[in-house]
């Protein structure tokens, strides 16, 4: 057999340690696919109410186009 690490009385081959390490890193690095995403909001600050309405309507209209 080849060289092996002895951990808690058991012989563990190096390739199993490598696979376990890569698997653990993969689980820690990959983001959670089941996590709910918060919808993005835009904070509109204008002095003019007409500008504010125009921007809100523009964003609403173009966000509907992206959804379709």
UniProtKB/Swiss-Prot annotation:
Record field: transmembrane: 15-31
Domain of life (superkingdom): Eukaryota
Pfam family, one: ATP19
Annotated compartments: Mitochondrion inner membrane
Further remarks about this protein from its record: Present with 1320 molecules/cell in log phase SD medium.
PANTHER family in the cross-refs: ATP SYNTHASE SUBUNIT K, MITOCHONDRIAL
Name of the protein this chain belongs to: ATP synthase subunit K, mitochondrial
Gene giving rise to this polypeptide: ATP19
